[in-house]
């Protein structure tokens, strides 16, 4: 049909037009705005250079029967270190910080050598310690082999500085002077004719007792008994009973306050009224506490291996005030000598402008007239203190009283 043909032609034409139309591409999305430039990062401040730390070791018995003395010594070292850091010390053109490495030797020789090696391994520049001769002497070999200076504030056995080591120094008089002075005092002043001697078998106790006995005999007295115990003993009935039978005018004990206190109590219970003498190990307020009412006035006589009098006493008194304010306790015995030992060691470093032991050791050995709170400090060729003082004391009214300072 004509109409049908016409419609077919129209449809075909429409299809051709549709097939021939070119498709327009979709418009491209608008470009995102460029991000603002990030601010340049602020450079972090350069880290401060690490502090130049100088390690100084301290060793004493901070556990055991005489821990009160070991802690006293450690406090003396800590006070010195804190003051040095507050003041500021320059070595080799740099400000240095001192660090205290404190170790406990429990007054035991084996533990003493172990902590000595520990300090050597930690590369300390020097060591102040030990307290007891029995730990100081074996430890000194380790320090000597490492070339590390050692200053003992309290060891009195002469052997310590007579081993030929260049690294050993002491701050107090030795047993030759300590025991010798007490021996002469027992005979000449206390008028002791018969004297009993007890020691605790330690290097310190045995050493001071031997020197005391020699001096007694040289002064014309007689040693009527020699007994020994240990530094950990608590029962002395057997040896005191033996001594009582000898009726001595004086009983001398070479040992420490922790043993002497109970010994005095047992002397009272056995009705032994002899004078009681000892070295610096018993010359403490702790002895007075431990002995209690067993100590009669003018019964106990002792000598502290050190001491100051006259104008020099001002410095010691000022130290005691500082110590009490910082640690809320009184000085027990050797804290001032530890304090001085640290300062003497650092003064040698300053003089050498180095904390290298090899460089400052010669300066330490030539220390002369250093003004310490314990008095002037000078060392002789062996490392012993020159003109070491002794302070004679007695107990009256439950207090230690100074009788005299001797040199």
Residue ranges of predicted features:
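Extracytosolic ligand-binding ectodomains
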Residues: 2-6, 10-12, 20-407
